[in-house]
Protein backbone atom coordinates (compact mmCIF):
# COMPACT_ATOMS: atom_id res chain seq x y z
CA UNK A 1 0.00 0.00 0.00
CA UNK A 2 1.30 3.47 -0.84
CA UNK A 3 2.57 5.63 1.99
CA UNK A 4 0.34 8.51 3.15
CA UNK A 5 0.74 11.69 1.13
CA UNK A 6 2.16 13.55 4.14
CA UNK A 7 5.05 11.09 4.38
CA UNK A 8 6.16 11.91 0.86
CA UNK A 9 7.47 15.25 2.05
CA UNK A 10 9.14 14.17 5.28
CA UNK A 11 12.46 13.38 3.63
CA UNK A 12 12.30 16.17 1.05
CA UNK A 13 15.47 18.28 1.28
CA UNK A 14 15.15 21.89 2.38
CA UNK A 15 15.45 24.45 -0.39
CA UNK A 16 18.91 25.97 -0.31
CA UNK A 17 18.69 29.76 0.08
CA UNK A 18 20.09 31.67 -2.86
CA UNK A 19 23.35 33.55 -2.43
CA UNK A 20 22.59 36.81 -0.56
CA UNK A 21 24.56 39.03 -2.94
CA UNK A 22 24.32 40.66 -6.36
CA UNK A 23 27.01 38.41 -7.84
CA UNK A 24 24.45 36.82 -10.16
CA UNK A 25 23.74 40.22 -11.70
CA UNK A 26 27.41 41.15 -12.02
CA UNK A 27 28.19 37.80 -13.63
CA UNK A 28 25.32 37.87 -16.14
CA UNK A 29 27.19 39.32 -19.11
CA UNK A 30 24.12 39.38 -21.35
CA UNK A 31 22.39 42.10 -19.28
CA UNK A 32 22.08 45.47 -21.02
CA UNK A 33 19.51 47.28 -18.87
CA UNK A 34 19.48 47.14 -15.06
CA UNK A 35 16.88 49.08 -13.08
CA UNK A 36 17.28 49.87 -9.40
CA UNK A 37 14.17 51.10 -7.63
CA UNK A 38 11.85 51.07 -4.66
CA UNK A 39 10.23 53.33 -2.10
CA UNK A 40 11.72 56.76 -1.49
CA UNK A 41 14.41 57.07 1.17
CA UNK A 42 15.66 53.48 1.15
CA UNK A 43 19.06 54.11 -0.41
CA UNK A 44 18.38 53.36 -4.08
CA UNK A 45 21.00 55.81 -5.32
CA UNK A 46 23.77 54.46 -3.11
CA UNK A 47 22.96 50.94 -4.25
CA UNK A 48 22.70 51.82 -7.95
CA UNK A 49 25.99 53.75 -7.89
CA UNK A 50 27.66 50.88 -6.05
CA UNK A 51 26.32 48.42 -8.61
CA UNK A 52 27.64 50.59 -11.45
CA UNK A 53 31.07 50.64 -9.79
CA UNK A 54 31.19 46.85 -9.57
CA UNK A 55 29.98 46.48 -13.16
CA UNK A 56 32.73 48.83 -14.36
CA UNK A 57 35.26 46.22 -13.23
CA UNK A 58 33.91 43.49 -15.49
CA UNK A 59 32.34 45.41 -18.40
CA UNK A 60 33.91 47.54 -21.13
CA UNK A 61 31.72 50.60 -20.54
CA UNK A 62 28.99 51.36 -18.00
CA UNK A 63 26.47 54.20 -17.91
CA UNK A 64 24.37 55.10 -14.88
CA UNK A 65 21.33 57.29 -15.55
CA UNK A 66 19.33 59.10 -12.88
CA UNK A 67 15.66 59.48 -13.80
CA UNK A 68 14.85 60.92 -10.37
CA UNK A 69 14.34 64.73 -10.46
CA UNK A 70 16.26 64.86 -7.15
CA UNK A 71 19.40 63.77 -9.07
CA UNK A 72 21.17 62.18 -6.14
CA UNK A 73 23.97 60.53 -8.12
CA UNK A 74 25.73 63.91 -8.23
CA UNK A 75 25.65 63.86 -4.43
CA UNK A 76 26.70 60.21 -4.21
CA UNK A 77 29.80 60.67 -6.37
CA UNK A 78 30.32 64.27 -5.16
CA UNK A 79 30.51 65.37 -8.78
CA UNK A 80 28.13 67.43 -10.89
CA UNK A 81 26.47 65.57 -13.77
CA UNK A 82 24.19 66.78 -16.57
CA UNK A 83 21.98 65.35 -19.31
CA UNK A 84 25.15 64.45 -21.24
CA UNK A 85 27.07 61.29 -20.23
CA UNK A 86 30.08 62.41 -18.17
CA UNK A 87 32.97 60.27 -17.01
CA UNK A 88 32.96 59.63 -13.26
CA UNK A 89 36.18 60.82 -11.66
CA UNK A 90 38.54 57.97 -10.88
CA UNK A 91 37.09 55.64 -13.54
CA UNK A 92 37.96 55.18 -17.19
CA UNK A 93 34.82 53.31 -18.25
CA UNK A 94 32.08 54.56 -15.90
CA UNK A 95 29.83 57.40 -17.05
CA UNK A 96 26.85 59.14 -15.45
CA UNK A 97 24.02 61.39 -16.62
CA UNK A 98 20.90 62.92 -15.08
CA UNK A 99 17.61 63.56 -16.85
CA UNK A 100 14.28 65.00 -15.74
CA UNK A 101 11.64 63.11 -17.75
CA UNK A 102 8.81 65.18 -16.29
CA UNK A 103 9.76 68.20 -18.45
CA UNK A 104 7.65 68.39 -21.60
CA UNK A 105 5.52 70.76 -23.68
CA UNK A 106 3.52 71.76 -20.62
CA UNK A 107 6.73 72.91 -18.91
CA UNK A 108 7.76 75.35 -21.66
CA UNK A 109 7.60 78.91 -20.23
CA UNK A 110 4.48 80.84 -21.19
CA UNK A 111 6.57 83.97 -21.93
CA UNK A 112 7.77 82.33 -25.16
CA UNK A 113 4.21 82.18 -26.47
CA UNK A 114 2.84 85.54 -25.29
CA UNK A 115 3.85 87.62 -28.31
CA UNK A 116 2.28 85.34 -30.93
CA UNK A 117 -1.35 84.29 -30.71
CA UNK A 118 -0.75 81.55 -33.30
CA UNK A 119 2.00 80.03 -31.17
CA UNK A 120 -0.14 80.33 -28.07
CA UNK A 121 -2.92 78.40 -29.78
CA UNK A 122 -0.38 75.84 -30.98
CA UNK A 123 0.88 75.23 -27.48
CA UNK A 124 -2.64 74.74 -26.17
CA UNK A 125 -3.46 72.28 -28.95
CA UNK A 126 -0.27 70.30 -28.36
CA UNK A 127 -0.99 70.20 -24.64
CA UNK A 128 -4.49 68.97 -25.41
CA UNK A 129 -3.05 66.24 -27.63
CA UNK A 130 -0.59 65.23 -24.94
CA UNK A 131 -3.30 65.14 -22.28
CA UNK A 132 -5.21 62.56 -24.31
CA UNK A 133 -2.56 60.11 -23.12
CA UNK A 134 -1.30 60.97 -19.63
CA UNK A 135 2.46 60.66 -19.39
CA UNK A 136 3.15 60.93 -23.15
CA UNK A 137 5.50 63.93 -22.74
CA UNK A 138 7.40 62.11 -19.99
CA UNK A 139 7.43 58.95 -22.09
CA UNK A 140 8.75 60.84 -25.13
CA UNK A 141 11.60 62.09 -22.95
CA UNK A 142 12.43 58.49 -22.04
CA UNK A 143 12.18 57.53 -25.70
CA UNK A 144 14.69 60.19 -26.74
CA UNK A 145 17.10 59.13 -24.00
CA UNK A 146 16.82 55.49 -25.06
CA UNK A 147 17.46 56.42 -28.68
CA UNK A 148 20.62 58.31 -27.72
CA UNK A 149 21.85 55.67 -25.29
CA UNK A 150 21.38 52.85 -27.80
CA UNK A 151 23.53 54.77 -30.26
CA UNK A 152 26.35 55.13 -27.71
CA UNK A 153 26.81 51.36 -27.38
CA UNK A 154 27.45 51.13 -23.65
CA UNK A 155 27.96 47.55 -22.46
CA UNK A 156 25.34 47.99 -19.75
CA UNK A 157 23.10 50.81 -18.50
CA UNK A 158 22.04 51.15 -14.86
CA UNK A 159 18.94 53.22 -14.08
CA UNK A 160 18.74 54.96 -10.72
CA UNK A 161 14.99 55.40 -10.80
CA UNK A 162 12.58 57.74 -9.06
CA UNK A 163 10.14 56.32 -6.46
CA UNK A 164 7.87 53.48 -7.56
CA UNK A 165 5.15 55.36 -9.47
CA UNK A 166 7.65 57.09 -11.78
CA UNK A 167 9.51 53.83 -12.25
CA UNK A 168 6.44 52.00 -13.49
CA UNK A 169 5.83 54.79 -16.00
CA UNK A 170 9.42 54.43 -17.19
CA UNK A 171 8.96 50.71 -17.76
CA UNK A 172 5.66 51.30 -19.56
CA UNK A 173 6.93 54.14 -21.72
CA UNK A 174 7.09 52.12 -24.99
CA UNK A 175 3.33 51.43 -24.83
CA UNK A 176 2.54 55.02 -23.87
CA UNK A 177 4.66 56.42 -26.70
CA UNK A 178 3.09 54.16 -29.33
CA UNK A 179 -0.40 55.21 -28.29
CA UNK A 180 0.54 58.86 -28.01
CA UNK A 181 2.27 59.00 -31.38
CA UNK A 182 -0.77 57.36 -32.92
CA UNK A 183 -2.96 60.12 -31.50
CA UNK A 184 -0.58 62.84 -32.68
CA UNK A 185 -0.53 61.34 -36.16
CA UNK A 186 -4.34 61.50 -36.24
CA UNK A 187 -4.40 65.24 -35.50
CA UNK A 188 -1.28 66.25 -37.43
CA UNK A 189 -3.36 68.09 -40.05
CA UNK A 190 -5.11 70.10 -37.34
CA UNK A 191 -1.84 71.32 -35.86
CA UNK A 192 -0.03 71.66 -39.20
CA UNK A 193 -0.24 75.52 -39.24
CA UNK A 194 1.62 75.68 -35.96
CA UNK A 195 4.23 72.96 -36.45
CA UNK A 196 6.72 75.00 -38.49
CA UNK A 197 6.70 77.87 -35.99
CA UNK A 198 6.93 75.52 -33.03
CA UNK A 199 9.87 73.64 -34.55
CA UNK A 200 11.73 76.88 -35.28
CA UNK A 201 11.13 78.07 -31.73
CA UNK A 202 12.47 74.79 -30.33
CA UNK A 203 15.55 74.92 -32.56
CA UNK A 204 14.47 72.02 -34.77
CA UNK A 205 14.73 73.94 -38.04
CA UNK A 206 12.08 74.33 -40.74
CA UNK A 207 9.74 71.35 -40.63
CA UNK A 208 6.23 70.73 -41.92
CA UNK A 209 3.62 68.30 -40.61
CA UNK A 210 4.67 65.45 -42.90
CA UNK A 211 8.35 65.82 -41.96
CA UNK A 212 7.46 65.81 -38.27
CA UNK A 213 5.29 62.73 -38.76
CA UNK A 214 8.17 61.03 -40.54
CA UNK A 215 10.55 61.81 -37.66
CA UNK A 216 8.05 60.48 -35.14
CA UNK A 217 7.65 57.29 -37.16
CA UNK A 218 11.44 56.84 -37.16
CA UNK A 219 11.29 56.70 -33.36
CA UNK A 220 8.88 53.76 -33.25
CA UNK A 221 11.31 50.99 -34.30
CA UNK A 222 13.69 52.04 -31.51
CA UNK A 223 10.81 52.08 -29.03
CA UNK A 224 9.66 48.62 -30.07
CA UNK A 225 13.21 47.26 -29.91
CA UNK A 226 13.70 48.62 -26.39
CA UNK A 227 10.31 47.24 -25.37
CA UNK A 228 11.33 43.76 -26.51
CA UNK A 229 14.64 44.02 -24.66
CA UNK A 230 12.91 45.15 -21.45
CA UNK A 231 10.85 41.96 -21.49
CA UNK A 232 13.85 39.72 -22.14
CA UNK A 233 15.33 38.42 -18.84
CA UNK A 234 18.63 37.83 -20.61
CA UNK A 235 18.93 41.57 -21.28
CA UNK A 236 16.95 43.30 -18.52
CA UNK A 237 16.46 42.88 -14.79
CA UNK A 238 15.08 44.96 -11.94
CA UNK A 239 16.66 45.17 -8.49
CA UNK A 240 14.29 46.14 -5.67
CA UNK A 241 15.72 48.14 -2.78
CA UNK A 242 13.86 48.32 0.52
CA UNK A 243 14.29 48.57 4.27
CA UNK A 244 12.97 46.11 6.85
CA UNK A 245 9.77 47.99 7.70
CA UNK A 246 6.12 47.29 6.99
CA UNK A 247 5.49 50.09 4.47
CA UNK A 248 8.67 49.36 2.53
CA UNK A 249 7.91 45.63 2.44
CA UNK A 250 4.37 46.38 1.24
CA UNK A 251 5.68 48.71 -1.47
CA UNK A 252 8.21 46.10 -2.58
CA UNK A 253 5.52 43.45 -2.95
CA UNK A 254 3.37 45.87 -4.98
CA UNK A 255 6.36 46.71 -7.17
CA UNK A 256 7.19 43.05 -7.80
CA UNK A 257 3.59 42.35 -8.78
CA UNK A 258 3.58 45.29 -11.20
CA UNK A 259 6.89 44.16 -12.70
CA UNK A 260 5.36 40.74 -13.31
CA UNK A 261 2.44 42.38 -15.14
CA UNK A 262 4.95 44.23 -17.32
CA UNK A 263 6.90 40.99 -17.94
CA UNK A 264 10.01 42.55 -16.37
CA UNK A 265 12.44 40.10 -14.76
CA UNK A 266 13.30 40.58 -11.09
CA UNK A 267 15.08 38.16 -8.79
CA UNK A 268 17.19 40.40 -6.54
CA UNK A 269 16.22 42.38 -3.45
CA UNK A 270 18.50 44.62 -1.40
CA UNK A 271 17.43 45.13 2.20
CA UNK A 272 19.28 48.26 3.25
CA UNK A 273 19.98 50.13 6.51
CA UNK A 274 19.93 47.08 8.79
CA UNK A 275 20.91 47.61 12.42
CA UNK A 276 23.25 45.05 13.98
CA UNK A 277 23.71 45.62 17.74
CA UNK A 278 27.27 45.49 19.03
CA UNK A 279 27.64 43.21 22.09
CA UNK A 280 30.35 45.44 23.56
CA UNK A 281 28.16 48.54 23.31
CA UNK A 282 24.64 47.75 24.57
CA UNK A 283 21.98 50.04 23.09
CA UNK A 284 18.28 49.65 23.92
CA UNK A 285 17.19 51.52 20.81
CA UNK A 286 19.45 49.41 18.58
CA UNK A 287 18.18 46.20 20.17
CA UNK A 288 14.57 47.27 19.65
CA UNK A 289 15.23 48.28 16.07
CA UNK A 290 17.04 45.03 15.37
CA UNK A 291 14.10 43.05 16.76
CA UNK A 292 11.60 44.83 14.49
CA UNK A 293 13.81 44.47 11.44
CA UNK A 294 14.40 40.77 12.13
CA UNK A 295 10.65 40.17 12.08
CA UNK A 296 10.28 41.69 8.61
CA UNK A 297 13.45 40.01 7.36
CA UNK A 298 12.00 36.64 8.30
CA UNK A 299 8.82 37.50 6.41
CA UNK A 300 10.80 38.52 3.34
CA UNK A 301 12.86 35.34 3.34
CA UNK A 302 9.67 33.27 3.49
CA UNK A 303 7.92 35.33 0.84
CA UNK A 304 10.85 35.62 -1.58
CA UNK A 305 12.70 32.33 -1.23
CA UNK A 306 13.39 32.38 -4.98
CA UNK A 307 15.13 35.78 -4.76
CA UNK A 308 18.70 36.72 -3.96
CA UNK A 309 18.26 38.88 -0.83
CA UNK A 310 21.30 41.03 -0.04
CA UNK A 311 21.42 42.52 3.47
CA UNK A 312 23.30 45.79 3.88
CA UNK A 313 24.07 47.54 7.18
CA UNK A 314 23.14 50.99 8.39
CA UNK A 315 26.44 52.86 8.46
CA UNK A 316 27.55 55.54 10.94
CA UNK A 317 28.44 57.86 8.06
CA UNK A 318 27.13 58.99 4.68
CA UNK A 319 28.23 57.12 1.58
CA UNK A 320 29.45 60.09 -0.44
CA UNK A 321 32.34 60.45 -2.83
CA UNK A 322 33.82 57.92 -5.25
CA UNK A 323 36.04 56.35 -2.59
CA UNK A 324 33.18 55.73 -0.14
CA UNK A 325 30.93 54.40 -2.91
CA UNK A 326 33.71 52.05 -3.96
CA UNK A 327 34.08 50.75 -0.39
CA UNK A 328 30.32 50.31 0.03
CA UNK A 329 30.04 48.53 -3.32
CA UNK A 330 32.02 45.57 -1.96
CA UNK A 331 29.04 44.75 0.27
CA UNK A 332 27.07 43.84 -2.85
CA UNK A 333 29.40 40.90 -3.47
CA UNK A 334 30.38 39.85 0.05
CA UNK A 335 27.66 39.16 2.65
CA UNK A 336 28.00 41.56 5.56
CA UNK A 337 29.25 39.95 8.75
CA UNK A 338 27.79 41.68 11.82
CA UNK A 339 29.60 41.76 15.17
CA UNK A 340 29.55 38.36 16.87
CA UNK A 341 26.65 37.78 19.26
CA UNK A 342 26.85 37.14 22.94
UniProtKB/Swiss-Prot annotation:
GO molecular function: ATP binding; ATP hydrolysis activity; metal ion binding
Keywords of this entry: ATP-binding, Cytoplasm, Endoplasmic reticulum, Hydrolase, Metal-binding, Nucleotide-binding, Nucleus, Transport, Zinc
CDD domains, per the entry: ArsA (cd02035)
Disulfide pattern: none
Subcellular location: Cytoplasm; Endoplasmic reticulum; Nucleus, Nucleolus
GO cellular component labels: endoplasmic reticulum; nucleolus
Domain of life: Eukaryota
Active site: 68
Main enzyme class: hydrolase
Residues that hold ATP according to the record: 39-40, 43-46, 245, 272, 313, 315
One GO-annotated biological process of the protein: protein insertion into ER membrane
Chain positions recorded as Zn(2+) binding sites: 283, 286
Pfam (any one): ArsA_ATPase
Function: ATPase required for the post-translational delivery of tail-anchored (TA) proteins to the endoplasmic reticulum. Recognizes and selectively binds the transmembrane domain of TA proteins in the cytosol. This complex then targets to the endoplasmic reticulum by membrane-bound receptors GET1/WRB and CAMLG/GET2, where the tail-anchored protein is released for insertion. This process is regulated by ATP binding and hydrolysis. ATP binding drives the homodimer towards the closed dimer state, facilitating recognition of newly synthesized TA membrane proteins.
Protein family: Belongs to the arsA ATPase family.
Subunit structure: Homodimer. Component of the Golgi to ER traffic (GET) complex, which is composed of GET1/WRB, CAMLG/GET2 and GET3/TRC40. Within the complex, CAMLG and GET1 form a heterotetramer which is stabilized by phosphatidylinositol binding and which binds to the GET3 homodimer.
PANTHER family: ARSENICAL PUMP-DRIVING ATPASE ARSENITE-TRANSLOCATING ATPASE, ATPASE GET3
Protein's recorded name: ATPase GET3
Organism: Xenopus tropicalis (Western clawed frog)
Encoding gene per record: get3
Amino acid sequence: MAAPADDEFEDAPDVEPLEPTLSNVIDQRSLRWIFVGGKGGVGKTTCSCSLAVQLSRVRESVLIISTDPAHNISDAFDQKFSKVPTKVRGYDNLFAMEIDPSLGVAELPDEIFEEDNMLSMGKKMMQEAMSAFPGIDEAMSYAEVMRLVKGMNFSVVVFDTAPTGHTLRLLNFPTIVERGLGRLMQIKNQISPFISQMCNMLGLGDMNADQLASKLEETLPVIRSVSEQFKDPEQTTFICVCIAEFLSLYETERLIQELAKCSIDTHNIIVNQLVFPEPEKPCRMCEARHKIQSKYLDQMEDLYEDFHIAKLPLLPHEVRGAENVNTFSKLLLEPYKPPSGK
